[in-house]
Amino acid sequence: MDSNDSEFGIGDWQRLLRSLGEDPSRQGLRETPERVTRAWAHWTRGYKQDPAAILKTFADGGESYDELIVVRQIPVYSHCEHHLAPFFGHATIGYLPTGHIVGLSKLTRLVNCFAARLQVQERLTQQVAQSLLEHLQPKAVGVILRCRHMCMESRGIAVAGEETVTSAMLGDLKTNAAQRAEFLALAESHE
């Protein structure tokens, strides 16, 4: 799995370590290039995943359900495209179905699909919402992401603990104040 023209691999990580003044052959670093190569393959696996395949609907008797479906506290782990620094937090997803529902775990898988790419939080939020709208064709979609960004916490302003909140409201959640209020209440509920 060595480096070639199209893949950043073990040899590249060894060169990076040498450029930092490290010896890639020393005890603590010997296996680091291989581990980091595998880690980045994992952290960017979303490029090889298809949201349409994740959001296949199924018939289980829930097709007549016509109230909001909300899943909260979906873990988000991604890397910013500007510094390759991690950002992480939680997502809340809600949608108002029109006969097409998916297993609840599919919402987590969808977040993981888009988060496992180089991202900005704003685009990640929109990609999740647009994908749900396109593949499930619901009356409404709401997505809220709350994340901490290591590019802010470990460099630059270097303030720990700040949280960035982004949202995307589509369909009735964008135009219907009552629906939007219900989604936001369910998203914030601690009961």
Curated annotation (Swiss-Prot):
One MF term in the entry's GO annotations: GTP cyclohydrolase I activity
InterPro entries tied to this protein: GTP-CH-I_C/QueF (IPR043133), GTP-CH-I_N (IPR043134), GTP_CycHdrlase_I (IPR001474), GTP_CycHdrlase_I_CS (IPR018234), GTP_CycHdrlase_I_dom (IPR020602)
Enzyme type, top EC level: hydrolase
Pathway(s) per entry: Cofactor biosynthesis; 7,8-dihydroneopterin triphosphate biosynthesis; 7,8-dihydroneopterin triphosphate from GTP: step 1/1
A GO biological-process term: tetrahydrobiopterin biosynthetic process
Catalytic reaction equation(s): GTP + H2O = 7,8-dihydroneopterin 3'-triphosphate + formate + H(+)
Assigned keywords, A-Z: GTP-binding, Hydrolase, Metal-binding, Nucleotide-binding, One-carbon metabolism, Zinc
GO (cellular component) term, any one: cytoplasm
Binding positions (Zn(2+)): 80, 83, 151
EC assignment: 3.5.4.16
SUPFAM superfamilies: Tetrahydrobiopterin biosynthesis enzymes-like (SSF55620)
Subunit: Toroid-shaped homodecamer, composed of two pentamers of five dimers.
PANTHER family: GTP CYCLOHYDROLASE 1 (PTHR11109:SF7), GTP CYCLOHYDROLASE I (PTHR11109)
Family: Belongs to the GTP cyclohydrolase I family.
HAMAP family (UniProt xref): FolE
Name listed for the protein in its UniProt record: GTP cyclohydrolase 1
Organism this protein belongs to: Nitrosospira multiformis (strain ATCC 25196 / NCIMB 11849 / C 71)
Gene name of the record: folE
